[in-house]
């Protein structure tokens, strides 16, 4: 989709691993918009501290990742707010921590969202499970019909499904 509001820059970060079945959901989602839209798109195996600097140049970031959590619709789009968290591993940094680092280090307030898509299989395989593929298609439709138009309109805060009720 073209015609996005270039005054409000948005980056989509696809998180996952395309060699581990449903863990590829984030990357496959990013693939869909890498060439066909004005969204900036990047891929990550996992989030890194350096991503705080990257997203500081944007107004909005959408983190897309597979999830083991069961969801009624097979996907969930929700706001992500900056929050400091402490982990005893450098291999686990969540989106809220990245947003917090962006605000603390770069004094940048970036609107953040998490788009989680339910997955079921995580073994070494380059194919989505049948259920995850269905959720993926539903998530794409939702994103194209509800999220992209809001971004294109320059909406400063995208309403999540729970906020519409």
PLM region spans:
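N-terminal catalytic or cofactor-binding beta/alpha core of small enzyme domains
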Residues: 1-119, 126-138, 142-165
């Amino acid at each position: 989709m073209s015609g996005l509001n270039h005054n409000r820059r948005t980056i989509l970060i696809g998180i996952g691993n395309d060699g581990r079945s449903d863990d590829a959901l984030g990357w496959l989602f990013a693939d869909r918009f890498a060439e066909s839209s004005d969204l900036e798109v990047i891929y990550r195996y996992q989030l890194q501290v350096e991503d705080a600097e990257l997203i500081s140049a944007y107004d909005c970031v959408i983190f897309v990742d597979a999830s083991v959590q069961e969801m009624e619709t097979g996907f969930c789009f929700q706001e992500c707010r900056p929050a400091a968290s402490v982990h005893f591993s450098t291999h686990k940094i969540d989106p809220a921590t990245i947003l917090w680092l962006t605000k603390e280090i770069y004094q940048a307030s970036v609107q953040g969202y998490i788009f989680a898509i339910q997955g079921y299989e995580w073994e070494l395989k380059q194919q989505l499970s049948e259920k995850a593929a269905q959720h993926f298609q539903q998530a794409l439709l939702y994103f194209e019909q509800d999220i992209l138009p809001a971004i294109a309109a320059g909406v400063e805060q995208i309403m999540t499904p729970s906020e519409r009720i």
